[in-house]
Curated annotation (Swiss-Prot):
The protein's name in its UniProt record: Immunoglobulin-binding protein EibA
InterPro entries: Pilin-like, YadA_C
Disulfide pairings: none
Upregulating conditions: In strain ECOR 9 expression is greater at 37 than 27 degrees Celsius and increases upon entry into stationary phase (at protein level). Upon expression from a plasmid in strain AB1157 (with its own leader sequence) more protein is seen at 37 than 27 degrees Celsius (at protein level).
Keyword entries, A-Z: Cell outer membrane, Coiled coil, Membrane, Protein transport, Signal, Transmembrane, Transmembrane beta strand, Transport, Virulence
Length: 392
């Protein structure tokens, strides 16, 4: 890949020719035109270098490939630092990448030195910029996503994938679903606490009622002991039975026992009703306990799904870094230059903690036509490319 690049700096005081390249100064930026296939000043790309912060950006020139974008910035090549790194953001906005380019690095260092000879030696070509644009465009289109099976769960194997959704969308859905389950569980716990309180109140009432029936049973026993000696009992104004002595109203002992039995029957009925309510409350508690157990299992299933999703995310991240390393290695392969000759080249590339090795061959048929092919390997994965170049 040629390192030639035409620098143009237009001066407000003069317009001259230096090394066959015109140049100008606009504000603090210096503009450069990429060399075309004839090693002359091209009109497809313009590079603007800022000597103050040692950064650069590449714009379309007056004869850019897309007519409506001519003389406008190229978004993917708008952030270049002093070391030749291009910063881009993935298509889904989730990840920022830094792509290194050797030719851009050499040019940035030469431009920073301000030495004309160094700049002339490290000039870029239009082909350099095309290759760089293709690399960053391919990386920018990468999107971290999650594969789902037909039931909406994270797919275990590629064959089970029925749908792909962005990672942010899937995590938002899982978070909302987990919140709903947690809220339902909390509501069930609140109802259970309320029922427990009601049960305690019923138990207290039952205890008080039992005390009253014990007293009534004692009174009945005392009355039965005196039946043989007394045939009458007194009846007070509130309907209770008293000793016949001194009472205004009296009834037979048998009638008194019947009246007393009716009262105890009503008490027994009240106790039975309370027992029924206690039984229903106990059943409700058991039902709620089962619901809590079911919700607990649901939460455990969600936890397992999140663990599976995290493993998938980690694998996608590793695969992305291997792909970036392979892309970097393939970019380092050289294109054949001499007509009628084969060339073989090898290159290494890396991204983050992943590395890749690439090998390739090429053949130039004539001055205008050349072809090359390459393959890159990284941790068991492989990627390849084949290209044909026509110059006209």
């Amino acid at each position: 890949m040629s390192k030639k690049f035409t620098k143009a700096v237009l001066s407000a005081a003069m317009a001259g020719v230096l090394f066959g390249v015109s140049f100008d100064i606009m504000a603090a930026e210096q503009s450069y035109s990429a060399l075309n296939a004839q090693n002359g000043a091209g009109s497809i790309y313009k590079v603007y270098y800022n000597p103050d912060n040692k950064t650069a950006h590449i714009d379309w020139g007056g004869l850019g490939d897309v007519e409506k974008e001519r003389n406008k910035p190229i978004p993917l090549l708008s952030k270049i630092d002093g070391n030749g790194n291009v910063t881009i953001t993935s298509a889904d906005g989730s990840t920022t990448f830094t792509v290194y380019d050797k030719e851009v690095h050499d040019f940035m260092k030469a431009a920073a030195s301000g030495k004309t000879d160094d700049i002339k030696t490290n000039l870029l070509t239009e082909q350099n910029i095309r290759d760089l644009y293709n690399r960053v465009s391919a990386i920018q289109q990468m999107e971290t996503n999650v594969g789902l099976d037909e039931y909406g769960n994270v797919a275990v194997t590629p064959n089970e994938i029925k749908e792909r959704v962005s990672l942010q969308r899937y995590l938002a859905w899982e978070s909302a679903n987990s919140t709903i389950v947690a809220n339902e569980l909390e509501a069930q716990k609140g109802k259970l606490d309320a029922q427990k309180g009601e049960l305690e109140a019923q138990k207290k009432n039952l205890g008080e009622l039992t005390t009253r029936t014990d007293k009534i049973d004692a009174a009945a026993a005392a009355t039965a002991a005196k039946v043989e000696s007394r045939t009458l009992v007194g009846v007070s104004s509130d309907g209770t039975l008293t000793r016949a002595e001194g009472a205004k109203n009296t009834i037979s002992v048998n009638d008194g026992l019947v009246a007393l039995s009716g009262r105890t029957d009503r008490i027994d009925a009240a106790v039975g009703a309370i027992d029924g309510r206690v039984t229903r409350n106990t059943q409700s508690i058991e039902k709620n306990s089962k619901a809590i157990a079911a919700n607990t299992r649901t939460l455990q299933q969600h936890s397992a799904r999140l663990d599976s999703q995290q493993r998938q995310i980690n694998e996608n991240h590793k695969e992305m870094k291997r792909a970036a390393a392979q892309s970097a290695a393939l970019t380092g392969l050289f294109q054949p230059y001499s007509v009628g000759k084969f060339n073989a080249s090898a290159a290494v590339g890396g991204y983050s903690d992943e590395q890749a090795l690439a090998v390739g061959v090429g053949y130039r048929f004539n001055e205008q036509t050349a072809a090359k092919a390459g393959v890159a390997f990284s941790d068991g994965d492989a990627s390849w490319n084949v290209g044909v170049n026509f110059e006209f």
